[in-house]
């Protein structure tokens, strides 16, 4: 799996589920004949194969529960020594399967709807997921990071949800983590921006299954700033690395036994 993949698509099919509309976008070179009629014919053709999905074995992990707990203890020791304030350790799980994994994505869309849903088929591998988080967004001359830290389940009751959100706002651990991530975002944007400010702070946002605390940090790009470099300098997300970010990533590379691959990356 590549670490970075940039694709310039000739055709884009845009679904607007709110308006129940479908828009076709085509990138044409000067003098090139349009291929939209063939694309429209393919869309209208309902003669397509359907494949089932089934798991073919148990869920496994490259490391045992005890090994993962030992890794967490190493992370805690580094925090206690003052090497980092926060470190986010992860563990890989593997599920063998047969059939069409797009069915899993469709199920994910139904049971965990989020602002960002994605499915990419690169031939030899697929990446799909569901996320509420905007890592970095650049519009005109402004860059935005939306740190998310602080999560609790939803109850299904409006009054109870409000109480859960208030408890989340009062939780010292969740607040400490959130403040740290806001500071990281301010620092990351300051490398290429000026007038860096917090637009809103620790705002409870309600999703299908959980309540998150979300802030928004913005900055105006410096006159000589490059937008791509601005994004690169914010990567990876502090929510999946730690603080100070560089030292946390160094320790993660030492502690975790495998590369994270697409996990913790960005889709856009």
Residue ranges of predicted features:
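Extended alpha-helical targeting/anchoring segments
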Residues: 1-268
């Amino acid at each position: 799996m590549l670490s970075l993949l940039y694709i310039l698509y000739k055709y884009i099919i845009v679904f607007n589920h709110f308006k129940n509309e479908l828009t076709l976008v085509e990138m044409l070179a000067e003098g090139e004949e349009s291929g939209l009629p063939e694309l429209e014919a393919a869309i209208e053709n309902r003669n397509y194969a359907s494949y089932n999905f089934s798991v073919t074995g148990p869920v496994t992990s490259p490391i045992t529960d005890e090994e993962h707990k030992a890794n967490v203890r190493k992370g805690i020791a580094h925090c206690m020594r003052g090497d980092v304030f926060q470190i986010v350790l992860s563990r890989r799980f593997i599920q063998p399967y047969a059939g069409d994994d797009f069915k899993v994505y469709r199920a994910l869309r139904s049971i965990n709807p989020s602002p960002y849903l994605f499915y990419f088929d690169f031939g030899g591998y697929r990446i799909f997921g569901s996320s509420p988080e905007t890592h970095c967004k650049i519009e005109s001359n402004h860059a935005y990071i939306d740190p998310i830290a602080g999560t609790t389940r939803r109850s299904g009751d409006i009054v109870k949800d409000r109480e859960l959100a208030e408890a989340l706002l009062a939780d010292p651990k969740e607040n400490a983590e959130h403040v740290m991530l806001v500071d990281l975002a301010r620092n990351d944007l300051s490398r290429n921006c000026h007038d860096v400010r917090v637009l809103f702070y620790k705002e409870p946002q309600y999703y299908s299954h959980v309540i998150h605390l979300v802030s928004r940090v913005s900055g105006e790009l410096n006159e000589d700033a490059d937008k791509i470099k601005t994004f690169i300098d914010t990567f990876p997300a502090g929510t999946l690395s730690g603080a100070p970010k560089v030292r946390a990533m160094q320790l993660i590379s030492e502690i975790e036994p495998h590369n994270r691959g697409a996990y913790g990356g960005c889709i856009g």
